[in-house]
Amino acid sequence: MCAAEARPARVAMLGGTFDPVHMGHLRSAVELREALELDRVHMVPARVPPHRATPGVSAERRAALLALGIGDTPGLAVDDREIARDGPSYSADTLASLREELGPQARLVMALGHDAYLNLAEWHEPQRLFDLAHIVVIDRPDHDRPLAPALQELVAGREVSDVETLMQAPAGSLLALRLPTRMAISATSIRERLRRGDSIRYLVPEAVERDLLARGLYA
């Protein structure tokens, strides 16, 4: 067996409301896959996000828009397991489901933005997240907020400085990763533009724009 065949699978979960999906989400997923040399990035729309208001557009429609946005992009996939599951969309449960599918040796990563990371200690079963996966924080050059004591305690001794070290084990470590492209695009601003009737051209993929306008979503 050659070395490439022997390498454990590398898979990331990138969750969110995707309300709606935009170029920032998709570019981050592509660059995350490249930086970590991942086999797949599972983009997981939340049905009932635990830490924010439930979106006004259904989870099924948000997932359909996400599929339009991904198109035929290699290595990116819509994962609807949180939509199929009743109750709050807890990341720990999603990671447990992925871990069961992938097996104990797969390198499983949960990627999240820096703002979400600052509240990680308040998430459902935060310790279990590290039992199941690595956490990669998509870093921001302008962040300067100190970590809360509970978060410092949660991540103590887990930080690694490079991808090679991260991938030596199936789970349990924390890596801050600065991606090459940081787009100042927010789903909130896109929803506001749609309500005003302003253009969202080049903020979302063309297929997503067509579907949003045809259905009058967020208008």
Curated annotation (Swiss-Prot):
InterPro entries: Cyt_trans-like, NadD/NMNAT, Rossmann-like_a/b/a_fold. GO terms for biological process: NAD biosynthetic process. CDD domains: NMNAT (cd02165). Keywords: ATP-binding, NAD, Nucleotide-binding, Nucleotidyltransferase, Pyridine nucleotide biosynthesis, Transferase. Its EC number is 2.7.7.18. SUPFAM superfamilies: Nucleotidylyl transferase. This is Probable nicotinate-nucleotide adenylyltransferase. Catalyzes the reversible adenylation of nicotinate mononucleotide (NaMN) to nicotinic acid adenine dinucleotide (NaAD). One of its GO terms (molecular function) is ATP binding. Belongs to the NadD family. Disulfide bonds: none annotated. Pathway: Cofactor biosynthesis; NAD(+) biosynthesis; deamido-NAD(+) from nicotinate D-ribonucleotide: step 1/1. It catalyses: nicotinate beta-D-ribonucleotide + ATP + H(+) = deamido-NAD(+) + diphosphate. HAMAP family: NaMN_adenylyltr. It is an enzyme of class 2 (transferase). Pfam families: CTP_transf_like. Signal peptide: none annotated. It comes from the Bacteria.
